[in-house]
Amino acid sequence: MEMDLPSAIANAQKEHFHADWFLKCIHWLLSLAILVIFSSIGSVYSLINSYNRRSLIIQTISFVYSIIDSIWGYRDYFGHENKMCHGTGIFLIFFYLTVLIIGFYNSKINNSNKVISVTYKVLSCLIVLCGVIRLSAGVVSMLEFCYDDHTGQCNAHGIMGMSFIVYGVLLSVVLVVPWLRVNKGKYSQEMYDSTVIMVWGVINTFTEHRPWEPWSHGDYQHTSMGIIFWAAGLLGMFLSINRKRNFMPALTMILTGYAMSGHVQELIISTKVHAFFGYVLMFGGLARIVEISFLLDDKDESIDGEIRSFQYLTPFALILSGILFMGANEEQMQLVVNLGADHSSYILTITSAAMILQLWILALLRFYLKLTETSKTNNSAYDDINTLDHSDGQSQFELDNFSV
């Protein structure tokens, strides 16, 4: 029996749907490899002056790919280009171009201008963050999320979740890099943390509720979170005077986790994911208090001089909670329900992603320390040779502009 015309059209559309989905997945994975993984290696190279040339090569390759990526773009199943992907793609092209211009100029002047050198390093690290945003836009386009009324809610989850991840990354850097782990600055770590928390709280207090609309249950929840943030931040700043360590940033994590653990959602699975997010955040705050109170001496080093495995818990908890919160938006929770999965399966998958991300961050930090050690060794060897006497009275090596 021959298939009728409507059925044939439906089957053709279904085959096109699967082929289009396969190509989008390949495109996304390729973007992950080049715009995030490859670019993050280039960012590490950029932090050491003697490896700037390698970082520029990697950034040039990524820049060329970003142009191709923007031209290709992500297209949803209705045939029109997703505006967010197009916008982030164009922004990434100009951002890469800016970094390359500054990087080539910095290389030309041999890192002699500290402002240019520091600017290049900072922008090189921000490239990775831009790549992550680009990939997030790809997911939004592939799954057709965050359109219309869902846009604000997705943005809130994305921004807040990314903030937790960035905080976890910063704590990992401070923990692993020795010259940052030993606090010799004017202020303690908690002074910086409390200041950011205070500013964030002020912004949330006055932006979570529209004055011309009646107060809702969600408005009370989000505004109260903003109030506790700036109140805790101010107290933390006061307790940080004279480079004192204190518990307020960690206590803020615990209070935030407590509030989110009881944040009831429309879907049961969403309520459970939010609850687990809260538990993880509370655990991370408790681990931070234990670390500051019992594992660090007066010089902010571990008592035995080594990093204990317990100290990795807080950065990991922040990264995990950030990914959980980013993945707890309304439409993503509905997708999990439609797939027939439960909250435990989804949480385990998210936790696996957080572990891989933490692994990659720690690997990059170890790579940075190794490059720094190698660069210093090479410089020391060159300096020793440069001081040797030669029969012609001339030095065989010119290293006046060479710096780590």
Model-found features: residue ranges?
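Extracellular/lumenal N-termini and interhelical loops of multi-pass eukaryotic membrane proteins
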Residues: M1-H18, I133-A137, F325-V336, D342
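N-terminal signal-anchor module of multipass membrane proteins
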Residues: M1-R75, F95-Y96
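Membrane-proximal first intracellular loop
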Residues: N11-L23, S46-L56, Y77-C85, I109-L123, ...
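Transmembrane-helix exit/juxtamembrane "anchor" motif
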Residues: G42-I48, I101-I109, S172-W179, L234-K244, ...
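Eukaryotic helix-linker segments that join adjacent hydrophobic helices
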Residues: L56-L135
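Non-transmembrane, juxtamembrane loop and terminal tail segments
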Residues: S112-V115, L126-L129, T195, M253-L255, ...
